[in-house]
Amino acid sequence: MIRSMISRLLPLLFAAAVFAEAPRPRPGFEGVGVRFTSASASGSGKAEDSATGFEVTGNFPLLKSGSWQYDWGFRYAQTRHDWTAAPVSFDLIRGASLNLSGYASTEAGRSRYAVLQVNGDAAEGVSLGDALTVQALYGADWRRSDTFTLGYLFLAETRAVRSPMVLVVPTFRWQFAPDWSLGTGRKSLVLERKLDEAWRASLTLAYQQEEARLADFAGQRQDYESERVAALFGLRRTADGRTDELTLGWAFRAQARREVGGVESEYDLAPGLLISLGSRWRF
């Protein structure tokens, strides 16, 4: 019965993975992390974007009220781009976020979480204050059995290039074998295997997105958005309050949008190799 349920819900489950950008708080969520990324283009004749960057994140306890634990958090990121045969030519994107999040768990196997996040992503020379977007997220999970958790996610957000979005979709995690699980992640669908008490391996179908306010073009506002669909292999080690993760993957579908003065244009990006290395320290 569970298998037939998942097959019917797969389109919506993928939508949950695609659009759930804000962090989903949970017990033990507090900590700081750093991640380095690299993306190289394949040289297939399409517009090419080779990029390197880093991201620093943190989540810190704020207060406890009843069954809810509230945190505040931040993100700061920089990505440097090297373009070939593309209609855009910016070099550096800076991004920052502030969020207020909360989570609550009950003895009945239900957990709830909520996030309000303000983002700003802009090219060098453009104020982050001119590139603000807002995202609100609320969700709940129910542990239906020892191996299956089902929930939903409500998301409302403003976006740099396209119109605001409101979405309600299901989420899940299914442990279909003692060391195997399948579930929705952050903009991803994740198949994970437990190797031992410290190590996990995963295969992920991921959606990656970048939005930014660019410098005005001929006196008109200019915005940029890119999207990638990628297959990723990851190794993660968690021990002594620290998590280290290495990810290798291939972006097999990539597209970008550029909006100037309200007029939008699209172009394809070349596929390419993705590498990510990160660590997170829990409090």
Task: Set out the residue ranges of the language-model regions.
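Outer-envelope beta-barrel architecture signal
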Residues: 25-32, 66-72, 108-114, 144-150, ...
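Outer-membrane beta-barrel translocator domains and adjoining extracellular loop/strand segments
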Residues: 40-49, 81-89, 124-132, 161-169, ...
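Transmembrane beta-strands of outer-membrane beta-barrel pores
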Residues: 36-42, 74-82, 118-124, 154-160, ...
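Outer-membrane beta-barrel "beta-signal"
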Residues: 168-174, 179, 231-240, 268-283
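Residue-level signature of outer-membrane beta-barrel architecture
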Residues: 58-62, 102-106, 140-142, 174, ...
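Outer membrane beta-barrel transmembrane domains
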Residues: 86-89, 190, 198-265
